[in-house]
Regions:
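Extreme N-terminal segment that seeds HTH/winged-HTH DNA-binding domains in transcriptional regulators
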Residues: 1-22, 26-27
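Electropositive phosphate-/nucleotide-binding environments in soluble metabolic enzymes
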Residues: 1-8, 33-37, 113, 157, ...
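Gly/Thr-rich phosphate-binding beta-strand-loop-beta motif of the actin/hexokinase/Hsp70
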Residues: 61-100
């Protein structure tokens, strides 16, 4: 559990501090250089981080290797469900929008089915060889977490419709 927390901490520090070195990570986290190197190596092997080689420095001495998140290999699928359309995007782990598209919705279509269809038929193919690290579905409305339903929304979902459960089931095979 502690190792997982430290992995997350190291990943977030690399994500927020492009070209950071292992030594700097050790200084910020108060972890040993050996521990930091082990954690960074695990993130590199997992394909989440890349070692960009030595960074340019003004002073002499050994130049540390710069680390960055691997935005080319990792994306998050984002679907924003609007009244008349779905806005689709793939956002790389380093914050770049790698793909963007729009799909119209008509009043007769089941939005839940369209969301799942957009994910499997548009976003996954657009991701190519990149790993889809997660799916973010934006639904404008008030969510009842206990019942996994929506109280109020502008997208035409009836109150009490278990849309969250239906989306979970529709995307479960991923």
């Amino acid at each position: 559990m502690i190792r997982t927390e430290n992995l997350c901490k190291i990943y977030h520090l690399i994500n927020n501090n492009a070209n950071i070195s292992r030594a700097r990570l050790a200084g910020i986290t108060n972890l040993s250089k050996t521990t930091v190197s082990s954690l960074v190596d695990e993130l590199i092997r997992g394909g989440y981080v890349v070692d960009c080689g030595t960074e340019a420095r003004a002073h002499q001495g050994r130049r540390p290797n710069a680390l960055q998140v691997d935005g080319d290999s990792n994306v998050v699928a984002v679907i924003s469900w609007r009244r008349a359309r779905l806005d689709l995007a793939l956002v790389s782990s380093d914050g770049r929008v790698a793909f963007r598209d729009r799909l119209p919705l008509n009043e007769q279509s089941d939005g839940t089915d369209r969301v799942a269809d957009a994910f499997f038929r548009r976003l996954l193919p657009a991701a190519g060889g990149a790993r889809v690290m997660g799916v973010c579905i934006i639904i404008p409305g008030i969510v009842n977490e206990e019942q996994r339903s929506i109280y109020s929304t502008v997208i035409g979902v009836d109150p009490g419709d278990p849309v969250i459960e239906r989306l979970s089931e529709a995307l479960a095979r991923y």
